[in-house]
Amino acid sequence: MKVLVILFGAMLVLMEFQKASAATLLEDFDDDDDLLDDGGDFDLEANSDASSGNGNDSNDAVPEKRRACADLRGKTFCRLFKSYCDKKGIRGRLMRDKCSYSCGCRG
């Protein structure tokens, strides 16, 4: 009986470790700026600089720029990792949760 309890506890610990490591892996991909090599950032910076004629406009452009970059990063991320959408297991579930809005993963 003790052996079963120990094995069950070890299994739970390994499952939690796998979830944590998969989540940190996905966070690293989400925050990686190397995925944005298509030059999209330069256009966004030019637009925010062009609208800085008034002092208030430049402050409003910063959140809009961040939102646009996040959308581009999400689409690029999902395009690269769409193969995980149909997989079973923790990575498939994380991918469906992460990018169901843009890459068509069905939950």
From Swiss-Prot:
Tissues in which the UniProt entry reports expression: Is specifically expressed in the granular cells of the ectoderm.
Compartments (UniProt record): Cytoplasm, Stress granule; Secreted
Induction entry: Transiently up-regulated (6-fold) after challenge with the coral pathogen V.coralliilyticus and dramatically repressed (50-fold) thereafter.
GO cellular component terms listed in the entry, alphabetical order: cytoplasmic stress granule; extracellular region
Organism of this sequence: Pocillopora damicornis (Cauliflower coral)
Similarity-based family: Belongs to the coral AMP family.
Residues bearing PTM Arginine amide: R106
Origin: domain of life: Eukaryota
Keywords: Amidation, Antibiotic, Antimicrobial, Cleavage on pair of basic residues, Cytoplasm, Disulfide bond, Fungicide, Immunity, Innate immunity, Secreted, Signal
The protein's name: Antimicrobial peptide damicornin
Segments of skewed composition (Low complexity): 47-61
Residue stretch(es) of the prosequence: 23-67
Signal peptide positions (record): 1-22
Biased composition (Acidic residues): 37-46
Role description: Cationic peptide with probable antimicrobial activity against coral pathogens. Shows in vitro activity against Gram-positive bacteria and the filamentous fungus F.oxysporum (MIC=1.25 uM). Gram-positive bacteria tested are B.megaterium (MIC=20 uM), S.aureus (MIC=5 uM), M. luteus (MIC=1.25 uM), B.stationis (MIC=10 uM), M.maritypicum (MIC=20 uM). Has no or little effect against Gram-negative bacteria (the coral pathogen V.coralliilyticus (MIC>20 uM), V.aesturianus (MIC>20 uM), V.shiloi (MIC>20 uM), and E.coli (MIC=10 uM)). Has no hemolytic activity against sheep erythrocytes.
GO BP field: defense response to bacterium; defense response to fungus; innate immune response; killing of cells of another organism
Annotated region described as Disordered, given as residue ranges: 37-62
S-S bridge residues: C69-C105, C78-C99, C85-C103
